[in-house]
Amino acid sequence: SHFEEKLTISLERDLINWDKIIEFRERRHLIVHNSSIVNKKYISRTKNPFNFKIGEIIHIDNTYFINALKEFKLGGQLLLFNCWGNWDKENIDSALYEIMIQTFEDLKVKNYETVIKTCKYSEKITARNEQQEDIIFRVNINKAIALKKLKNNAELSKTLKNIQVGTASPIFKIAFQILNDNHNGLIDNFKKAIILDEINIDYYLEWPIFDFVRENEELHFQLLQTFKNN
């Protein structure tokens, strides 16, 4: 491909499903240029994963459209990060920061599979300074949140074993406790985080990590009181 051969940019084939993207493209061509009718070109280019017959009318439903958007988004993001890392090596900190932001934004819209794949991409990056270590730490937290949302407990357990919060600030200890379903001392850590301005009521009501405690009515009430009293 042009990216791999001319630009030496990896297509991240282990994370991006290029066969799906090819099928998305060819289906679009059919709809726009061939009255949605399946032809030989579509079948030969896509290997016909849906077993359509020549002459059959092709459609796009809501689920298909959303899945296509997610795959295009993932592919675009990872290619962008690869280009950034190869062409602007002096600003790797900024690229890593953007990875963290994108995983957080995907968590907010419940795009958990994209979060996990983007985080797996970040695992290929070796931190070279304290700031990069901090960002990668946050990315790993986002990965753990996505795994917990998907109830992938086996992968979640592996991820949590690689997260060390011994000397971390209260907000990260809170996240680690929540991800481990450990609520002992959680309110005390919230009080510390509030004092340090690491969290406020708006963050608590917005951030995906706190979905897991907001679902617990008693604990949620106690935490709301904690914000009122501190």
Which residues make up each language-model segment?
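Polyanionic, low-complexity intrinsically disordered segments
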Residues: N34-T159, I163-F172, F176-D188, K192-D202, ...
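A broadly tuned "polar low-complexity/structure-edge" signature
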Residues: H29, Y203-Y204
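Extended, amphipathic alpha-helical scaffolds
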Residues: F210-V213
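Flexible secondary-structure boundary motifs
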Residues: S1-N51, Q77
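Short aromatic/hydrophobic-glycine micro-motifs
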Residues: I9, E218-L219
